[in-house]
């Protein structure tokens, strides 16, 4: 097949498909945290300390809060996901095959995005482990208390990412899964969505969490507030296709430029939980 006979519409469909698949099925964590686009190599996220109100004497000066300002820096990294496609194989590709190629690149970049976010959250000093029984009601209530005592805002941006084993443990808790306790509108599977609001957190299963412990009997999970972690984006997912005459093949390259950073350790808990 001659290079000039490659359909431009095919290339455009491929590029659009990779980006849409990445947004829909790739990263599960990116949309839950702070994001900044258009970053040039390096950026700074600001962490502002707590302010305190004071009184003043009549006609007296108002004492300033003197808010603490802390800078958190992150440097972008480049990531690639490429695949060779033989020219003559184009005759064998149908729309299903193209979709497989699109999703493969999207999943690879999506997994890498979540890896960056998990790596940032792993640097937290806050922990809440349960390596004997896994998730229990007592453990979940203690997690709520930890966030409350840290004054982490209860504003709908608290999340808990758990492994599928921990998700099964949650479903065994009547307080999590029975309408007698939470109401029918808060059941774990409304319209097939695998996520649930409980105790002020959005709980959801994640298949990419690392194993831990002796013989990998535990899984490293995370509870976090969306503003406590940040993700910087220099270049979102893009795709291009080039023909290489010496291989009589096309190289499909998907790439992105991103990185993540922890902003506030009090808002991110790393949790080693029994499977």
What annotation goes with each model-predicted range?
Residues 1-74, 268-273:
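N-terminal "assembly arms/tails" that initiate or stabilize quaternary assembly
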Residues 41-42, 155-158, 218-219, 249:
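Short, surface-exposed beta-edge/turn micro-motifs
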Residues 53-55, 93, 169-172, 261-263:
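Short helix/loop capping segments that flank catalytic or ligand/cofactor-binding pockets
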Residues 69-91:
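Short acidic, glycine/tyrosine-flanked loop/strand segments centered on an H-E-D-like triad
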Residues 86-152, 270-275:
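Alpha-helical scaffold segments that mediate packing/assembly in large oligomeric complexes
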Residues 123-193:
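Extended, solvent-exposed, turn-rich assembly/linker loops in the middle of proteins
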Residues 192-245:
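Glycine/small-residue-rich hydrophobic helix-like segments
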Residues 240-275:
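Extended, compositionally biased alpha-helical segments that mediate assembly or anchoring
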